[in-house]
């Protein structure tokens, strides 16, 4: 006998079978839920031919009506667009191959239409003209002998986190540029120049800085075990930093996403969501245990 179960209660891995509400299921595979129904997920198809390098990171970049994929590996950078797609090597022409690794990967973003990427070992790279004939190049005005683990854009500024200067690592340090004009990159990162807005600030508390994501007009900075809010104030300090959550940080770079004004973050032991003031776990009991048990020890 077939019976229609309404209302559909979705996937629930926490409760035992005898405790499940009517219409709930305990596991599923190759389906997705939409408008209260489960439907077959149709799978995937190749959008492009095989990338010439093992891809460590990929960034979509739009110029006009054209979308490029900027793909970065351990030593090379490629871009691809169009159909049929053609992969083009856009590795920097000065400085040789890159020195990225699976431990550092690549990060960055796009500010004012200019992509900037960073691997924590080499000087940050920018794509001055988004075109197959233009290779990446070292970010102008970036200070010599300085690297950072993570770079992110916010407002008209670029931010660098977990900074190393002349071989000395400052894992709590936030460094920001002078604001960039539209279509350009920053003209200065010199925190000692009183005519510029560039600056530095060290966040207190245990744990290193891991990553940062905008949330409205606030940049949320995640350390390993705490979270800070960075807001623009102008004046002599330019930015204000204040503690937001203690005991809640981010597990690794890119372990967070913003959806409809809410951050969803993979912490050291949970997945939480917050709106900048209220924080809430979205896992419960068995699901949390399953997630932590099944993290890939090799890749993590």
Question: Where is each model-derived feature located?
Answer:
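Beta-sheet-dominated scaffold domains
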Residues: 2-7, 115, 165, 205-300
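A short beta-strand motif characteristic of beta-propeller blades
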Residues: 42-50, 87-98, 134-141, 195-202, ...
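Repeated scaffold domains used in trafficking and secretory/extracellular systems
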Residues: 52-61, 95-110, 142-153, 207-211, ...
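Short loop/turn segments that connect beta-strands within beta-propeller blades
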Residues: 81-84, 129-132, 232-235, 277-278
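Surface-exposed loop and turn segments in beta-propeller and other repeat-based domains
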Residues: 94-98, 183-205, 284-300
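Hydrophobic or amphipathic alpha-helical targeting/insertion segments
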Residues: 103-151
């Amino acid at each position: 006998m077939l019976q229609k179960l309404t209302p559909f209660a979705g996937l629930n891995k926490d409760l035992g079978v005898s405790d499940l509400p009517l219409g709930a299921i305990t596991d599923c595979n190759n389906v997705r839920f939409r408008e209260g129904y489960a439907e077959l997920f149709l799978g995937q198809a190749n959008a492009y031919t095989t990338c010439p390098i093992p891809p460590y990171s990929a960034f979509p970049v739009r110029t006009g009506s054209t979308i490029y994929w900027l793909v970065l590996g351990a030593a090379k950078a490629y871009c691809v667009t169009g159909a049929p797609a053609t992969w083009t090597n856009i590795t920097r022409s000065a400085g040789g191959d890159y020195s990225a690794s699976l431990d550092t990967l690549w990060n960055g973003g796009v500010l004012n239409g200019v992509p900037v990427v960073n691997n924590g070992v080499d000087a940050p790279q920018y794509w001055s003209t988004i075109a197959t004939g233009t290779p990446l190049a070292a970010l102008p005005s970036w200070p010599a002998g300085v690297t950072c683990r993570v770079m992110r854009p916010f407002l008209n500024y670029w931010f660098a986190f977990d900074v190393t200067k002349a071989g000395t690592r400052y894992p709590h340090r936030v460094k920001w540029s002078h604001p960039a004009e539209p279509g350009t990159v920053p003209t200065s990162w010199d925190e000692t120049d009183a005519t510029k807005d560039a600056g530095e600030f060290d966040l207190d508390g245990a744990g290193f800085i891991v990553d940062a994501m905008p949330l409205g007009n606030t940049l949320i900075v995640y350390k390993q075990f705490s979270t800070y809010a960075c807001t623009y104030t102008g004046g002599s300090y330019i930015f204000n930093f204040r503690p937001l959550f203690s005991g809640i940080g981010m597990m690794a770079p890119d372990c967070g996403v913003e959806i409809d004004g809410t951050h969803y973050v993979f912490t050291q032991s949970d997945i939480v969501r917050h709106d900048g003031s209220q924080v809430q776990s979205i896992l419960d009991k068995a699901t949390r245990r399953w997630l932590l048990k099944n993290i890939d020890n090799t890749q993590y």
